Amino acid sequence: MSEPFEIVAGALGVAGLFNNCVACFEYVQLGRHFGRDYERCQLRLDIAKVRLSRWGEAVQINDDPRFHSSAPIDKSVQLAKSIVEEILLLFESAQKTSKRYELVADQQDLVVFEDKDMKPIGRALHRRLKDLVSRRQKQTSLAKKTAWALYDGKSLEKIVDQVAGFVDELEKAFPIEAVCHKLAENEIEEVEDEASLTILKDAAGGIDAAMSDAAAQKIDAIVGRNSAKDIRTEKRARVQLGNVVTAAALHGEIRISDQTTNSVETVVGKGESKVLIGNEYGGKGFWDN
């Protein structure tokens, strides 16, 4: 029988607890009830993990001796240890809730998604984020766990929201804001297409401002400029100012990395006319009836 969490955790320093905390994300699977939201939810879980690992990288948690004592003297390190323990307990509680659900649920409700179920762009982002965290990680010390599943969106959002809140506290305890923003920029340095950046920006919303901002800035640099000095419409005419990235582009193989400039002086739309000042990527979108 494994030792109680309190005993094992008490023998570890913050660095050891932290690495085990980040590793907890690896054991979480998502149930089929997530449906079409699966990909976005998986990426939100990935981004919460990346943000937590980013804090560890920013404070050099695996190299700074302050984080290796099981009884730290530094007040900020004591606080960090308390917060990391809370995150571990959060996962422990969520796992227990899932286990109770499994006792009463039908077998068909316990089927989980796999990486292969993601669309190409989402799967590539998932793997990229996973590899990024792996490069930052040290070997864990707590007992290896078996995979377990979250079966509803509320449980997942509770985890990512609370992890984000805990990381907020960790970032406040250490003056590393500039470092974290730079690391976030580096994390998406090799992501060059608008569709991938748009997905990242959306998935990071509300849980990782640094990544969301970095993705938004990179999108602005990629898409170029679309402008019109004067736009007038009558009746049911429609004008779209800016690029259109359809669902087909977001979830397909399309890579959008061109920088364009589309500029007009005056647009007058009448009747049923439709005007796009920008580019459209993917199948049906703005022009659909």
Swiss-Prot record:
Main location: cytoplasm
Additional detail: In P.anserina, the het-s locus exists as 2 incompatible alleles, het-s and het-S. Strains of het-s genotype (e.g. A, C, s, and V) can display 2 distinct phenoypes, the neutral (prion-free) [Het-s*], which is compatible with het-S strains (e.g. D, S, U, and X), and the reactive [Het-s] phenotype, which causes rapid cell death in het-S strains. Although the two alleles het-s and het-S differ from each other by 14 amino acids, vegetative incompatibility between s and S strains can be attributed to a single amino acid difference in the proteins encoded by the het-s locus.
Lineage of origin: Eukaryota, Fungi, Dikarya, Ascomycota, Pezizomycotina
Single GO BP term: apoptotic process
Subunit and partners: Homodimer. Forms heterodimers with het-s.
Source species: Podospora anserina (strain S / ATCC MYA-4624 / DSM 980 / FGSC 10383) (Pleurage anserina)
GO cellular component term, pick one: cytoplasm
Known role: Responsible for heterokaryon incompatibility, a process that ensures that during spontaneous, vegetative cell fusion only compatible cells from the same colony survive (non-self-recognition). Interaction with the prion form [het-s] of incompatible cells triggers a lethal reaction that prevents the formation of viable heterokaryons.
Family annotation (Pfam families): HeLo, HET-s_218-289
Compartments where found: Cytoplasm
Domain notes per entry: The globular domain exerts a prion-inhibitory effect (in cis) on its own C-terminal prion domain. The het-S globular domain, but not the het-s globular domain, is essential for programmed cell death.
Record key words, sorted: Apoptosis, Cytoplasm
Protein's UniProt name: Heterokaryon incompatibility protein S
The keyword Protease appears for this protein: no
Gene3D superfamilies named in the record: Prion-inhibition and propagation, HeLo domain
Region (Globular domain): 1-227
Region Prion domain (PrD), residue ranges: 218-289
Keyword Cytoplasm belongs to the record: yes
Molecular functions per Gene Ontology: identical protein binding
